[in-house]
Amino acid sequence: AYKVTLKTPDGDITFDVEPGERLIDIASEKADLPLSCQAGACSTCLGKIVSGTVDQSEGSFLDDEQIEQGYVLTCIAIPESDVVIETHKEDEL
């Protein structure tokens, strides 16, 4: 399993995600995260990767440059390593 740490305005939340599992499926049980479409087509759930990698190829909202800057659509992100993500970043776009 991969260790996921979400840095939220209310503090850090850490949990494990199995390979191939969307982090939101676990995170939504542990934190009050902003969600809307849950399909990677909007920016409500936007976060920024501090460390680690995710697969967010299902998403359509972010362009390559935004992804290179570390932005991540947490609703569709599948961790590919241990990962640390800052949540609640929609206002930055």
From Swiss-Prot:
<dbReference type="GO" id="GO:0022900">
    <property type="term" value="P:electron transport chain"/>
</dbReference>
<keyword id="KW-0249">Electron transport</keyword>
<feature type="binding site">
    <location>
        <position position="42"/>
    </location>
    <ligand>
        <name>[2Fe-2S] cluster</name>
    </ligand>
</feature>
<keyword id="KW-0408">Iron</keyword>
<feature type="binding site">
    <location>
        <position position="37"/>
    </location>
    <ligand>
        <name>[2Fe-2S] cluster</name>
    </ligand>
</feature>
<feature type="binding site">
    <location>
        <position position="45"/>
    </location>
    <ligand>
        <name>[2Fe-2S] cluster</name>
    </ligand>
</feature>
<dbReference type="InterPro" id="IPR012675">
    <property type="entry name" value="Beta-grasp_dom_sf"/>
</dbReference>
<keyword id="KW-0001">2Fe-2S</keyword>
<protein>
    <recommendedName>
        <fullName>Ferredoxin-2</fullName>
    </recommendedName>
</protein>
<keyword id="KW-0150">Chloroplast</keyword>
<keyword id="KW-0813">Transport</keyword>
<keyword id="KW-0479">Metal-binding</keyword>
<keyword id="KW-0411">Iron-sulfur</keyword>
<comment type="function">
    <text>Ferredoxins are iron-sulfur proteins that transfer electrons in a wide variety of metabolic reactions.</text>
</comment>
<comment type="similarity">
    <text>Belongs to the 2Fe2S plant-type ferredoxin family.</text>
</comment>
<feature type="domain" description="2Fe-2S ferredoxin-type">
    <location>
        <begin position="2"/>
        <end position="91"/>
    </location>
</feature>
<keyword id="KW-0934">Plastid</keyword>
<dbReference type="InterPro" id="IPR006058">
    <property type="entry name" value="2Fe2S_fd_BS"/>
</dbReference>
<dbReference type="GO" id="GO:0046872">
    <property type="term" value="F:metal ion binding"/>
</dbReference>
<dbReference type="GO" id="GO:0009507">
    <property type="term" value="C:chloroplast"/>
</dbReference>
<dbReference type="InterPro" id="IPR001041">
    <property type="entry name" value="2Fe-2S_ferredoxin-type"/>
</dbReference>
<dbReference type="Pfam" id="PF00111">
    <property type="entry name" value="Fer2"/>
</dbReference>
<dbReference type="GO" id="GO:0009055">
    <property type="term" value="F:electron transfer activity"/>
</dbReference>
<feature type="binding site">
    <location>
        <position position="75"/>
    </location>
    <ligand>
        <name>[2Fe-2S] cluster</name>
    </ligand>
</feature>
<dbReference type="InterPro" id="IPR010241">
    <property type="entry name" value="Fd_pln"/>
</dbReference>
<dbReference type="GO" id="GO:0051537">
    <property type="term" value="F:2 iron, 2 sulfur cluster binding"/>
</dbReference>
<dbReference type="InterPro" id="IPR036010">
    <property type="entry name" value="2Fe-2S_ferredoxin-like_sf"/>
</dbReference>
